[in-house]
């Protein structure tokens, strides 16, 4: 009876230890493969030597993983080539700007030389006509003075005949237009009219024209100065006014 107990107890202990060994093997098997529980169970049921080929699978997976990490340096290579294109700076431009500066100095010298020549020539021409009036005898007549230079102004001209009264324009009468016009008349030594100049207008062209037509018909006697008739000029104001 005691032997049977020992045998049974020894068998139980062996079975218990066998189970422990199996469970430890199962724990190792579950740690090795990643995500394949069905395969690990079938391997444990057959035999232990099949656990060894599971290790190269891990090495293969470990070797395959770093291969996926390698493409990162490729991005760094892409950044470098388009970064610094040297197209914008053009060095020949400042050279073209500096060249014309000395060219401007050259014509300035050539221009400066002919200037005194022109001045000398003009001075010579100006000096040449100077002796001509000295050579000619002074023969100024009263008539020539009235044409070339401004004659003297006479306040009270002498009329030969009665003045012709200017005509009052009909349009100005109907509209009630009034005004005063003044003309300057140039006369030669004989008293003949040379020039008529409007000094101040009446504000209406019709009145100014009517006064001018009347003045042109006036005749003046010569103005005598120191016993010599001279050219002169006079101012004639004409006033247009409606009565009543």
UniProtKB/Swiss-Prot annotation:
SUPFAM superfamilies: TolA/TonB C-terminal domain. It comes from the Bacteria. It is found in: Cell inner membrane. Residues 133-146 have a biased composition (Polar residues). Keywords: Cell inner membrane, Cell membrane, Membrane, Protein transport, Signal-anchor, Transmembrane, Transmembrane helix, Transport. The keyword Transmembrane applies. Residues 51-146 are annotated as: Disordered. Gene3D superfamilies: 3.30.1150.10. Its main location: membrane. The chain crosses the membrane at residues 7-23. The keyword NADP does not apply. It is a single-pass membrane protein. InterPro entries: TonB (IPR003538), TonB-dependent_transducer (IPR051045), TonB/TolA_C (IPR006260), TonB_C (IPR037682). One of its GO terms (biological process) is transmembrane transport. GO terms for cellular component: outer membrane-bounded periplasmic space; plasma membrane protein complex. Belongs to the TonB family. NCBIfam families: tonB_Cterm (TIGR01352). Interacts with outer membrane receptor proteins that carry out high-affinity binding and energy dependent uptake into the periplasmic space of specific substrates. It could act to transduce energy from the cytoplasmic membrane to specific energy-requiring processes in the outer membrane, resulting in the release into the periplasm of ligands bound by these outer membrane proteins. Homodimer. Forms a complex with the accessory proteins ExbB and ExbD. PANTHER family: PROTEIN TONB, PROTEIN TONB-RELATED. This is Protein TonB. The lineage of its organism: Bacteria, Pseudomonadati, Pseudomonadota, Gammaproteobacteria, Vibrionales. The gene is tonB.
């Amino acid at each position: 009876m005691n032997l049977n107990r020992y045998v049974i107890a020894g068998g139980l202990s062996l079975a218990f230890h066998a189970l422990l060994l199996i469970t430890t093997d199962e724990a190792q098997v579950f740690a090795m493969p990643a995500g394949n529980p069905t395969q690990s169970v079938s391997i444990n049921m057959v035999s232990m030597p099949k656990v060894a080929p599971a290790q190269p699978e891990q090495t293969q997976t470990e070797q395959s993983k770093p291969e996926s990490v390698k493409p990162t340096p490729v991005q760094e290579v892409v950044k470098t080539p388009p970064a610094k294109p040297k197209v914008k700076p053009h060095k020949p431009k400042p050279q073209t700007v500096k060249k014309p500066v000395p060219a401007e100095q050259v014509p300035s010298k050539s221009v400066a030389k002919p200037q005194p020549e022109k001045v000398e020539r003009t001075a010579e021409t100006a000096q040449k006509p100077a002796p001509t009036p000295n050579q000619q005898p002074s023969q100024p007549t009263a008539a020539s003075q009235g044409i070339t230079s401004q004659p003297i102004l006479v306040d009270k001209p002498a009329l030969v005949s009665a003045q012709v009264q200017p005509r009052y324009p009909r349009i100005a009468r109907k509209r009630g237009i009034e005004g005063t016009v003044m003309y300057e008349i140039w006369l030669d030594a004989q008293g003949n009219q040379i020039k008529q100049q409007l000094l101040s207008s009446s504000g209406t062209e019709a009145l100014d024209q009517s006064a001018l037509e009347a003045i042109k018909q006036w005749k003046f006697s010569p103005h005598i100065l120191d016993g010599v008739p001279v050219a002169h000029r006079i101012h004639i104001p004409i006033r247009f006014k409606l009565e009543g």
